[in-house]
Amino acid sequence: MIHFGIIGAGDIARKFADAVRQLDNAEVIAVASKSLDRAQEWAAREHIPSYYGNYAELLANPRIDAVYIATTTNAHYDNILQCLQAGKHVLCEKSLVRSAHEALTVCSLAKQKNLFLMEAMWTRFLPKTTTAKQWIREGRIGKVKLMQATIGWKADPVYNKRLFDPALGGGSLYDLGIYPLEVLPYLVDEKILDMDAFVARHSTGVDDLVSMNLQLESCIANLQCSFTTKMPEDAYIYGEDGYIRLPKMHFGSRAELYNSADECIDSFDSGEENGFVYEVAEVVHCIENGLLESPICPHQMTIDAARITSEVLHLR
């Protein structure tokens, strides 16, 4: 049984706690927030036995094996270091950190401490993603030539202040674009060789629209993310003999396979569910088997993504 503690008592942590409850070999036993009242309220609502008004007290709990970090992006680096120094395995929300240097530092420390560390890129673990990857491996669309993905919605800067605050790690790339950036190369098992991008910025300075072109080893990927306009949240993988469509790419349950005549010849749908379950199951499996990183979501993926996002966000 793997016992989890949660740092950050927000909505996404609630989804994580629900996912853990669906597993027989994991349990959330504590939550910490900078506000003791918030932690107490959250723990009562989620039926969590222990709560703390600071992170250090949670990390001092000897029963906790692993920590799920659900704080804002700007806090991730320090939170991860604190957890690893306390001897806890770590699952941290995306984006894991904000630079390649930070990514290298936390990944190296995790290995030095013999601890598991993973970015919570849950889309990689969804059954529809696994299905699409298998179709590609089987050659059902032929050689992949192009991948495209868009993800965007019109965010309210007043209601969604965090998304537009550079001090909190806001911006569309950290919040939305990270999904296709880390999932599309995974589908074809290829490294990103080159990149160019265009960035539009909000008055606060964060990116609110990004368009990227990625040169992979044998194909090209285009992706766009935005807080300024609603976009179809779909991904397409185009091969020489057909294509795959992933509706609602980062959270949906469906994959569709089309031939060159634009006919749907196969499909998969896992149904509506809490998609975090597959990610958490992988974390538990890795910890129980002594793995320091997941083969599905390895450290190098996080390091590469951190390097690219940093390069994009420094464009003017």
Regions found by a protein language model. Give the residues of each.
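C-terminal helix-rich "cap/oligomerization" subdomain common to oxidoreductases
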Residues: A66-I69, E282-R316
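Active-site loop of classical SDR/Rossmann-like NAD(P)-dependent oxidoreductases
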Residues: F268-A281, C297
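Rossmann-fold dehydrogenase core element
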Residues: T105-W122, K143-K145
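Predominantly a Rossmann-like dinucleotide-binding segment in NAD(P)-dependent oxidoreductases
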Residues: T123-M195
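Beta-loop-alpha module in the N-terminal Rossmann-like domain of NAD(P)-dependent dehydrogenases
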Residues: E46-L109
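Contiguous beta-strand/loop segments that form the cofactor/metal-binding neighborhood of enzyme cores
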Residues: L181-R254, A281-N289
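N-terminal Rossmann-like dinucleotide-binding module
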Residues: M1-E46
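Hydrophobic residues in well-ordered beta-strands that form the structural core
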Residues: Y52, C92, L117-E119, L246
